[in-house]
């Protein structure tokens, strides 16, 4: 029986309040309105960004809400006026949309899009309302995606149609972390062949930077992390050497000083994949004078500020930032999926655990314990 135009009752992991475990609830999902798409989510990754909002540290965090932003699913129904997505399409929800008409999309200078930014930041659909209810209460959306639900509703401009032979339990992870790191090296920094790269933080994003650097032809890729259990995966993903700053530094040397010493004046490119403002400074200051480029990928706590001596920039170092790897979400993500399908991008190797929806809190636990690169939840 068709569910088109009808309210769907399904399971979702609801975040009723900050700092509390998610609760599996029966929720009601309204039909898509004009310009919207309703998706049956099959798989979703669990990311540190979900945890950040659940912790109560996110200034845009609104409760109760349905978290999740690394999803993969199939279009169940479409609203009036939707033309680029059809029922049955395999899609990845996008937390950075691509409308193609705003000044950001038409600038050819950024992958950001302003079309629905205000309402998305309020946990709402573009018309200022939500599509979720639970126990008679309105439930807010998260990052415009809310993939911790068996069904979700997105604006059409927040859906990337993907090839049907791409396994959704793997490519769902391209909705955030892997693409973020890979694109930071390929698109934002534009790492050059034969260059030296330093990566601070070897989680899923940092390992993806390594993949991007390899794809660009970098000669030397230095992975930096206090947790040496990450060095094995780091090697598998392309790092050529490693530094543990808690034990490997010469006496009296900072990590940036040590990197400058061992790279003949500094690295060509560095990437901060942690979200620590002190590490961001180190990542800039380990860059080579005259041309070194440091890209901030990690998300720092709200209100945190970065600092360095202006002379670091005056003498030619460049500080950049990257969101979703600079990847235009609807038009460029399919080519990254193609790269995975052509076995030129590792994705399967990130999946450490797979859980059913009712064990989603365990996925958060193993992430906090540093035991997983990514956990995938089967909805």
Swiss-Prot record:
SUPFAM superfamilies: GroES-like, NAD(P)-binding Rossmann-fold domains
Annotated InterPro entries: ADH-like_C (IPR013149), ADH-like_N (IPR013154), ADH_3 (IPR014183), ADH_Zn_CS (IPR002328), GroES-like_sf (IPR011032), NAD(P)-bd_dom_sf (IPR036291)
Location(s), subcellular: Cytoplasm
Cofactor comment text: Binds 2 Zn(2+) ions per subunit.
GO process annotations (BP): formaldehyde catabolic process
Catalyzed reactions per annotation: a primary alcohol + NAD(+) = an aldehyde + NADH + H(+); a secondary alcohol + NAD(+) = a ketone + NADH + H(+); S-(hydroxymethyl)glutathione + NADP(+) = S-formylglutathione + NADPH + H(+); S-(hydroxymethyl)glutathione + NAD(+) = S-formylglutathione + NADH + H(+)
Entry binding sites for Zn(2+) 1: 47, 69, 176
Disulfide bonds: none
E.C. no: 1.1.1.1, 1.1.1.-, 1.1.1.284
Keywords tagged on the record: Cytoplasm, Metal-binding, NAD, Oxidoreductase, Zinc
Keyword Kinase annotated: no
Family: Belongs to the zinc-containing alcohol dehydrogenase family. Class-III subfamily.
Function: Class-III ADH is remarkably ineffective in oxidizing ethanol, but it readily catalyzes the oxidation of long-chain primary alcohols and the oxidation of S-(hydroxymethyl) glutathione.
NCBIfam families linked to this entry: adh_III_F_hyde
Subunit annotation: Homodimer.
Full protein name: Alcohol dehydrogenase class-3
Protein source organism: Dictyostelium discoideum (Social amoeba)
